[in-house]
């Protein structure tokens, strides 16, 4: 006999008058006038079970129930009494009159009630098994499953083959740090956990599989943020014999299908924006287009002003000066307060800005006299006129300024733009539009200059193909080279990124030369790829999407940890299992490892 006939949350009026057997957990037990009510919960939801004292043995068992007891119930589905229905749940019109009650397993007192909301993340992650029983987490993980299934169905229908690639691979220290795995068999040598299956999926294209995908774990030993984990799940895809536009069209169709079939959402238009345009207008290569604020370019205007912060930035190599007009920010009633401006000043310092200059436009028609700011006296009339003209500022508006190296300005004022847009002020004043805002960012630079190392590094990775003809600039002017790279952005988050790959060994060698990777180093790190490219490698390209990020966006979760069953903390720890943890001396000896600071391991 089956342990249950139905899920709790799926018992509805359609089963009225039928006997059902349910299994789940006691969410609440309530005593009312000699009758016991049990809210029974499973992954599909709740159902109300009524225990009548007429069945003495069953009722006695019900009296001993506590929260989180695992029980089996057999009973009759009937309508709830008039006035007691609950429209918030699927089973809210019915209840189950209990005939038999079996305790499958009692529970100790839980660390918290499952429906408790104000829990610290430490408590939730330490008691993750209980946390995962909460309907919020169950919904998130069920949605994650549905997204993965939609992706698989779409790719299968389009001829993609699911192929696994190695988890123990070669360390290639480019970009983020690798997680290393010592080899017991090969003394002093290490595997690395993959940061991406990038090279293997390219090899699969050379091998002729034509269309590949996998939903796989990737690992990066980097500082964590709200949208990062040391291990994360990637929807990894590669295809041969497709142009860049065709690849983008295919994957846009995939994401549109996933959102439509799981959320019933139409993502609408996907505008295409160049990297240069995105960073120029929004200070970011993943702009949140729901925020209705844009940069105003002022570098040329500020070169001869007396305010050294502006003229210095405008005159330096790689410097930039921008304005950010905030409509209504200077109004006496409902504008930004002095405290808010001070808070924003501190905020931009996180991104390297030294301060945050501003001008309040009180009465534009009065010219200089209608402007309020400590910096106005250091700006000549022509500069002030140009600022007002370019920003389009009106009475009651406030203009923030960023002046520094271009990267600092873009990062600081770009983050400020997003913060203001998402603030209470921004939403009240129509600076934020509640919608799904997707776009493609294309034409990324091939290289970016690393000031510390004093050499170029790859913007995406060194296997990204340049725009046709741009390989000729790699030796003489690498900063001019544009790649066939592209990112899909949604609501200010990079959902996925990819590129057309280099499929010719001679072009790959030019990229290595531009990155100052010697032939010997290239052969040592990537010899297997260089060899493969010589065997008639096809034109190919692809993308990788962050499954964790997609589901986080869909659920509106505050943290990516809310859509992962067993995540790590921001200190890369698992509070449930207490990983990482010390290992015993015998294991270390087998791996030929001696700790340089054994006391540090004991201290943790």
From Swiss-Prot:
EC class name: ligase
Q: Which reaction does it catalyse?
A: tRNA(Asx) + L-aspartate + ATP = L-aspartyl-tRNA(Asx) + AMP + diphosphate
Q: Where is this region: Aspartate?
A: 198-201
| One term of GO molecular function | aspartate-tRNA(Asn) ligase activity
Gene3D superfamilies, per this entry? Answer: Bira Bifunctional Protein, Domain 2, GAD-like domain, Nucleic acid-binding proteins
Q: Name one GO cellular component term.
A: cytoplasm
Which BP terms from GO are recorded?
Answer: aspartyl-tRNA aminoacylation
Q: Where in the cell is it found?
A: Cytoplasm
Q: Where does ATP bind?
A: 220-222, 229, 494, 546-549
What SUPFAM superfamilies has UniProt attached to this entry? Class II aaRS and biotin synthetases, GAD domain-like, Nucleic acid-binding proteins
**PANTHER family, per the entry:** ASPARTATE--TRNA LIGASE, MITOCHONDRIAL, ASPARTYL/LYSYL-TRNA SYNTHETASE
- Known partners and oligomeric status: Homodimer.
Q: Which family does it belong to?
A: Belongs to the class-II aminoacyl-tRNA synthetase family. Type 1 subfamily.
Q: Which NCBIfam families match?
A: aspS_bact (TIGR00459), PRK00476.1 (NF001750)
Protein name, please?
A: Aspartate--tRNA(Asp/Asn) ligase
Gene encoding this chain?
Answer: aspS
């Amino acid at each position: 006999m089956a342990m249950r006939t139905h899920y709790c949350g799926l018992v509805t009026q359609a089963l009225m008058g039928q006997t059902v057997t349910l299994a789940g957990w006691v969410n609440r037990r309530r005593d009312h006038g000699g009758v016991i009510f049990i809210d029974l919960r499973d992954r599909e939801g709740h159902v109300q079970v009524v225990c009548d004292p007429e069945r003495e043995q069953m009722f006695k068992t019900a009296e001993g129930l506590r929260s989180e007891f695992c029980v089996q119930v057999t009973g009759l589905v009937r309508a709830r009494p008039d006035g007691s229905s609950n429209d918030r749940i699927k089973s809210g019109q019915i209840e189950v009159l209990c005939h038999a009650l079996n305790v499958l397993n009692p529970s100790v007192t839980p660390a918290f009630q499952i429906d408790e909301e104000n829990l610290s993340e430490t408590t939730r992650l330490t008691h993750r098994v209980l946390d995962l029983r909460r309907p919020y987490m169950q919904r998130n993980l069920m949605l994650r499953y549905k997204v993965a299934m939609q992706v698989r169905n779409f790719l299968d229908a389009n001829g993609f083959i699911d192929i696994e690639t190695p988890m123990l691979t070669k360390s290639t220290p480019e970009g983020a740090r690798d997680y290393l795995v010592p080899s017991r068999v090969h003394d002093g040598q290490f595997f690395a956990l993959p940061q991406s299956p990038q090279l293997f999926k390219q090899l699969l294209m050379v091998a002729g599989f034509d269309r590949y995908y996998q939903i796989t774990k990737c690992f990066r030993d980097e500082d964590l943020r709200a949208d990062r984990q040391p291990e994360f799940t990637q929807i990894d895809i590669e295809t041969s014999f497709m142009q860049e536009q065709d690849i983008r069209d295919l994957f846009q169709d995939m994401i549109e299908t996933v959102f439509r079939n799981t959320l019933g959402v139409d993502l609408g238009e996907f505008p295409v924006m160049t990297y240069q345009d995105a960073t120029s207008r929004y200070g970011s290569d993943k702009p949140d287009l729901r925020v209705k604020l844009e940069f105003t370019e002022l570098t040329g205007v500020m070169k001869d002003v007396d305010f050294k912060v502006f003229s210095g930035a405008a005159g330096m190599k790689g410097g930039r000066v921008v304005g950010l007009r905030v409509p209504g920010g200077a109004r006496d009633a409902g504008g930004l307060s002095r405290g808010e401006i001070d808070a924003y000043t501190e905020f931009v310092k996180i991104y390297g800005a030294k301060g945050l200059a501003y001008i309040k436009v009180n009465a534009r028609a009065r010219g200089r006299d209608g402007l309020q700011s400590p910096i106005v006296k250091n700006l000549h009339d022509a500069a002030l006129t140009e600022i007002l003209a370019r920003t389009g500022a009106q009475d009651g508006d406030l203009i923030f300024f960023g002046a520094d190296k271009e990267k600092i300005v873009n990062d600081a004022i770009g983050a400020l733009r997003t913060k203001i847009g998402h603030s209470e002020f921004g939403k009240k004043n129509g600076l934020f539009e509640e919608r799904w805002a997707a776009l493609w960012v294309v034409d990324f630079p091939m290289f970016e200059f690393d000031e510390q190392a004093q050499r170029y590094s790859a913007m995406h990775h060194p296997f990204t193909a340049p725009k046709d003809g741009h390989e000729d600039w790699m030796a003489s002017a690498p900063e001019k080279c544009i790649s066939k790279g592209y990112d899909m952005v949604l609501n200010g988050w990079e959902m996925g990124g990819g590129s057309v790959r280099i499929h010719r060994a001679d072009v790959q060698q030019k990229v290595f030369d531009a990155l100052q990777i010697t032939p010997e180093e290239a052969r040592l790190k990537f010899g297997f790829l260089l060899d493969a490219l010589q065997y008639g490698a096809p034109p190919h390209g692809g993308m990788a999407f962050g499954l964790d990020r997609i589901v986080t966006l869909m659920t509106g979760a505050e943290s990516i940890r809310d859509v992962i069953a067993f995540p790590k903390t921001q200190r890369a720890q698992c509070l449930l299992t207490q990983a990482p943890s010390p290992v015993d001396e015998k294991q270390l000896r087998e791996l030929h490892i001696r700790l340089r600071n054994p006391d540090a391991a004991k201290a943790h």
